[in-house]
A protein has these predicted regions:
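Residue-identity detector for glycine
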Residues: 2, 20-25
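Non-catalytic helical/linker scaffolds that mediate oligomerization, partner binding
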Residues: 26-176
Length: 176
């Protein structure tokens, strides 16, 4: 799978370069956000043009089959990426029960101290925790949040979410 991701990233970057989309003088630049289930995958993503990577730390990660990073690996990943101008987004995109909130708060606190660039979140309770514990770190709504309407996007923005990954079920025709 890692080879396929690298191949797709190379094709994508070639297309961007051919179109002359350097980000200079344009209203918006496409961000290449790549999954990183290991340090090896993270390095491959960065070396092949990813602007940002997303990864899991601890237990609040919906990427089934992906290994979560330890605290030491998370710190190593953040340093590796930041030295190269690449952002690290932490996935906290599972539903979190009341009894898990204290652990989620600890994960948010640790990740913020280590310097993650954004949280990718599903649970509204976790959105509130992120705002309370790490208000300087942007919050992105995960596709698992199932936002599929303009009203949903507006509500997420009111809750402090700066980016929304729309629901997978949303037809292309409805995305404007």
């Amino acid at each position: 799978i890692g080879i396929l991701v690298v191949y797709c990233m190379r094709i994508f970057m070639r297309c961007v370069r051919q179109r002359g989309n350097t980000g200079e003088g344009t209203a918006a630049m496409i961000e290449l956000l790549s999954p990183a289930g290991s340090m090896e995958a993270l390095r491959a993503a960065v070396q092949n043009g990813a602007n940002a990577v997303y990864l899991g730390y601890d237990a609040f990660n919906a990427r089934m089959g992906a290994r979560n990073f330890s605290v030491d690996e998370l710190q190593e990943a953040i340093v590796y990426c930041h030295v190269r101008g690449v952002q690290v987004h932490l996935t906290l995109n599972t539903l979190v029960s009341d009894r898990e909130m204290a652990r989620a708060a600890e994960v948010i606190r640790t990740a913020a101290v280590l310097g993650v660039d954004a949280f990718i979140v599903q649970d509204l309770g976790v959105v509130a925790l992120c705002r309370e514990i790490a208000p300087e770190v942007p919050i992105h709504a995960s596709t698992q949040m199932s936002i599929h309407s303009l009203e949903g996007v507006q509500q997420a923005a009111e809750l402090g979410v700066s980016r929304v990954v729309l629901a997978r079920e949303l037809p292309r025709e409805e995305i404007a």
